[in-house]
Amino acid sequence: MAEVPPGPSSLLPPPAPAAPAAAELRCPFPAGAALACCSEDEEDDEEHEGGCGSPAGGEAATSAKARSCLRCPQLPPEQQQQQLNGLIGPELRHLRAAATLKSKVLSAAEAAAPDGASKVTATKGAEGHPGERPPHSVPNNARTALPGRSEAAAAAAGAASDPAAARNGLVEGTEQQEEEEMDEQVRLLSSSLTTGCSLRSSQGREAEPGEDRTIRYVRYESELQMPDIMRLITKDLSEPYSIYTYRYFIHNWPQLCFLAMVGEECVGAIVCKLDMHKKMFRRGYIAMLAVDSKYRRNGIGTNLVKKAIYAMVEGDCDEVVLETEITNKSALKLYENLGFVRDKRLFRYYLNGVDALRLKLWLR
């Protein structure tokens, strides 16, 4: 039965210290090991020579490996373990940080520039300095963990072709893309708020999508507008008027009658007159003012009163007067905001027994 030769590690004596002349051949790698210094061809030759099974062949292979290991310094066990695990020792961490920063800068530059321009720049840089290395160059074994220029260009092209992936955070985008996405979100939010506000009026009434909610102010034009005026005033005012009362004011002073229209619907009306008072000065009188309850608190009443006053001023008016119920706080506030003052209290002025206040506005 053939004897199995003992392993080289158990028979060979420990390696002798390296000669001073061999110090110049040491490996420049801080985490250098015997496997990093030997090339693949040398390892293959050693395996071929030691594969014959004779003790002499094993001793020759062991001696050759020992001689190759003398060229690299022995490192502490923890650094050897880092080298075996693919980690970079403390001595090369600054090189890795510099390489990472350089790769980020190159990726951003290639993403901003066209593909052709980036390729031409890379080619010119390689041809201009063939023998020089960049100041922060990294050894080949450390570069394997970093993405190359071609990979960065491919990632930038993928981000440009797939905006949805970049928007979801799958690909790191530039600051300009982030600003554009933020502006787009703001525009979408503002458009949604505008749509929600335009489809609902201030009183909560739903509006149809194609309906025009713009308030228009027009002057009285024809008898066809009389039913709308009567409907508004009869519904909102406590004092009933006959058709003759309306015609007295509107037919004699049509230039002092204004309507507020929303689409084809009349939502507000004012009826006034202007004549001589005691043969001394011209007095304007606001006889009726009504606004639909669904459209109140939109400034319609104020705008109608202003238009009537401007028309009276064009007719050389000296003062404007009106009467309103003493309990109608909203009407009193509207007129007082326009400069009217309380002139006189009229007791039991209306048919329902409520007192009235006479308000006056002096124009001269």
Curated annotation (Swiss-Prot):
Residues 126-135 have a biased composition (Basic and acidic residues). It is found in: Cytoplasm; Nucleus. It is an enzyme of class 2 (transferase). Keywords: Acetylation, Acyltransferase, Cytoplasm, Nucleus, Phosphoprotein, Transferase. Residues 216-364 form the N-acetyltransferase domain. The modification N6-acetyllysine is found at K235. Residues 1-18 have a biased composition (Pro residues). InterPro entries: Acyl_CoA_acyltransferase, GNAT_dom, NAA30-like. The modification Phosphoserine is found at S39, S54, S192, S198, S201. It catalyses: N-terminal L-methionyl-L-leucyl-[protein] + acetyl-CoA = N-terminal N(alpha)-acetyl-L-methionyl-L-leucyl-[protein] + CoA + H(+); N-terminal L-methionyl-L-isoleucyl-[protein] + acetyl-CoA = N-terminal N(alpha)-acetyl-L-methionyl-L-isoleucyl-[protein] + CoA + H(+); N-terminal L-methionyl-L-phenylalanyl-[protein] + acetyl-CoA = N-terminal N(alpha)-acetyl-L-methionyl-L-phenylalanyl-[protein] + CoA + H(+); N-terminal L-methionyl-L-tryptophyl-[protein] + acetyl-CoA = N-terminal N(alpha)-acetyl-L-methionyl-L-tryptophyl-[protein] + CoA + H(+). Residues 152-164 have a biased composition (Low complexity). Catalytic subunit of the N-terminal acetyltransferase C (NatC) complex. Catalyzes acetylation of the N-terminal methionine residues of peptides beginning with Met-Leu-Ala and Met-Leu-Gly. N-terminal acetylation protects proteins from ubiquitination and degradation by the N-end rule pathway. Necessary for the lysosomal localization and function of ARL8B sugeesting that ARL8B is a NatC substrate. This is N-alpha-acetyltransferase 30. It comes from Mus musculus.
